[in-house]
């Protein structure tokens, strides 16, 4: 006889009895089946970490590339700005030069018109003979002018630089040192005729200076050191003798703020050059001090000496010196010598 299969109710009863009778067995069964879930979760976490690391690496690489590109762009912008500034400065310089040349051309045109209006019968008071006479005819802009020839004296046309501003204006500049581009270690003939660039460093020429100082004349010497300090010295009754008198220097009273007067020592001395020694010393001062000047024995000043630049300016005896200010071995940065009539009225 066949047995009937056990019903669901029967199986449920068996399970309950087993649970009550042997609870430890069920716990072992439960513990045996659960570890699969944590292992699965750990594996999933590792994959996510790897993905995150890969994303971070990609972002870091992208950020690095962006930084490099930004640096390149920044350098390019800086270079463009620098180039624009340089171009702007060049344009400003060209514009300034053009304005200066335009002003000088206008001055020359006006002077030529004055020359055309002049006659041989004019008095000396009407003639144009230096920057002070130009000033009195209302030329008030500093710059280059051409003085007309003097038929009575037989002097040729002369290009001069006029200072129409300093201490009332009307000054004719006879010497300038500011760039060091022109050597002042010259011979007698060159100092007689003049040399250099009228807009830069130059010596006007002893013959011209002699002619300009035949009337009572005032001399002004302006100096600048390498620290930017400015000083001046002025002398009344400045006279430069003729060539027969070796362009001898004569000076009157000194005024100024440069300290000790370092030009008075050269008063009443003849002019000397490397090929014509007229000093009052056994030594050949022009060769020792490497300039053309009114050397005595030898100098308290040497305004036509060697131009030494910053760093070399305080080591030599043959520089552009003024002993009463910085001593015998300090070469100045800038010097100008200028003259105008004693009776000049701004």
From Swiss-Prot:
What name goes with this protein? Angiopoietin-related protein 7
User: In which compartments does the protein localize?
Assistant: Secreted
Coiled-coil ranges from the UniProt annotation: 39-119
User: What terms describe the molecular function in GO for this protein?
Assistant: identical protein binding
Give yes or no: UniProt keyword Ribonucleoprotein.
no
GO BP field:
blood coagulation; negative regulation of vasculature development involved in avascular cornea development in camera-type eye; regulation of extracellular matrix organization; response to oxidative stress
Q: Where is the signal peptide?
A: 1-26
Q: Which Cys pairs does UniProt list as disulfide-bonded? A: 131-162, 285-298
Organism of derivation = Homo sapiens (Human)
Q: Name one GO cellular component term.
A: collagen-containing extracellular matrix
SUPFAM superfamilies recorded for this chain?
Fibrinogen C-terminal domain-like
């Amino acid at each position: 006889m066949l047995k009937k299969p056990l019903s669901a109710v029967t199986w449920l009863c068996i399970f309950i009895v087993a649970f009550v009778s042997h609870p430890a067995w069920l716990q072992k069964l439960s513990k045996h089946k659960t570890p699969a879930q944590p292992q699965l979760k750990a594996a999933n976490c590792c994959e996510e970490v790897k993905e995150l690391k890969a994303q971070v690496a990609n972002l870091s690489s992208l950020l690095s590339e962006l930084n490099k590109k930004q640096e390149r762009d920044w350098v390019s912008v800086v270079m463009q700005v620098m180039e624009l500034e340089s171009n702007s400065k060049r344009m400003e310089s060209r514009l300034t030069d053009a304005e200066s040349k335009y002003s000088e051309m206008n001055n020359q045109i006006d002077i030529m018109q004055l020359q055309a209006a002049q006659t041989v019968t004019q008095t000396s008071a009407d003639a144009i003979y230096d920057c002070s006479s130009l000033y009195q005819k209302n030329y008030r802009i500093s710059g280059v002018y051409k003085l007309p020839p003097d038929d009575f004296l037989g002097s040729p046309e002369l290009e001069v630089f006029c200072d129409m501003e300093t201490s009332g204006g009307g000054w004719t500049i006879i010497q300038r040192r500011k760039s060091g581009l022109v050597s002042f270690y010259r011979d007698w003939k060159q100092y007689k005729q003049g040399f250099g660039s009228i807009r830069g460093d130059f010596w006007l020429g002893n013959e011209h200076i002699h002619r300009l100082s035949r009337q009572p004349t005032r001399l002004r010497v302006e100096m600048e050191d390498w620290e930017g300090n400015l000083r001046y010295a002025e002398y009344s009754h400045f006279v430069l003798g003729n060539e027969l008198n070796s362009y001898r220097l004569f000076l009157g009273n000194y005024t100024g703020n440069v300290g000790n007067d370092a030009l008075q020592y050269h008063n009443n001395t003849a002019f000397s050059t490397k090929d014509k020694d007229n000093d009052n010393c056994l030594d050949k001062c022009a060769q020792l001090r490497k300039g053309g000047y009114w050397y005595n024995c030898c100098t308290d000043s040497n305004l036509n000496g060697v131009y030494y630049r910053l760093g070399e300016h305080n080591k030599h005896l043959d520089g552009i010196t003024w002993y009463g200010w910085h001593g015998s071995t300090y070469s100045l940065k800038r010097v100008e010598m200028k003259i105008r009539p004693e009776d000049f009225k701004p």
